[in-house]
């Protein structure tokens, strides 16, 4: 509701503005001749190598990333990743999105991932992250597929993606703040649930094997 304009926050007014994602963004990905061989995937190295399988719940699972050496990192500055960047999968399971906010070392992209950077003040990357997670973008992908499965998202496809955004960055940031706080609450609850599940599993092992007897 918040990213579609159907519900407005108090204190904001004015019609939402229609923009085109591609016209207001720099969209980059690893090009074919820069392709990596599996031998170049390192367990430790200079830079993270972000692949589509590293996306988890809107973030990147850094613990699951491979690495590449310095030469591969500096080869293409266009796909060097920074905090505040937006990533979008374009191969395999297309349309997965991640917002980068906890990067603590150099990172670059493997094939199959776009980095999306705003080049105008039409939108903030964090607001666009929530748009791309919403039904707005899912409906767009569904229209692209025309009912069939699509296995690749091209840059030319994103040229067709028009959307409506709040007219000010202040409203975008206010919406983002609410959604981020909700995500944080969900994350904390999931962590607590995971902890309790592990405790339960441990108790089951003890109780069901007779290692611990009830008094």
What does each model-found stretch correspond to?
Residues 5, 40-42, 90, 106-114, ...:
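A short glycine-rich beta-alpha junction/loop motif
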């Amino acid at each position: 509701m918040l990213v579609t304009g159907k519900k407005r926050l108090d204190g904001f007014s004015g019609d939402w503005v229609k923009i085109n994602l591609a016209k207001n963004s720099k969209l980059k990905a690893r090009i074919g001749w820069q392709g990596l061989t599996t031998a170049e995937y390192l367990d430790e190295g200079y830079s993270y190598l972000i692949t589509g399988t590293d996306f988890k719940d809107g973030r990147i699972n850094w613990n699951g990333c491979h690495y590449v050496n310095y030469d591969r990192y500096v080869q293409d500055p266009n796909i060097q990743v920074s905090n505040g960047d937006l990533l979008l999968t374009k191969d395999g399971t297309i349309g997965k999105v991640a917002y980068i906010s906890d990067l603590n070392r150099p990172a670059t992209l493997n094939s199959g991932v776009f980095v999306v950077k705003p080049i105008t003040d039409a939108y903030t990357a964090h607001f666009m992250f929530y748009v791309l997670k919403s039904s707005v973008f899912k409906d767009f992908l569904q229209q692209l597929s025309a009912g069939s499965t699509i296995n690749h998202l091209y840059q030319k496809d994103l040229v067709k993606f028009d959307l409506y955004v709040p007219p000010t960055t202040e409203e975008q940031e206010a919406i983002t703040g609410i959604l981020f706080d909700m995500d944080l609450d969900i994350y904390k609850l999931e962590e607590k649930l995971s902890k309790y599940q592990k405790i339960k599993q441990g108790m089951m092992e003890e109780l069901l094997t007779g290692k611990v007897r009830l008094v």
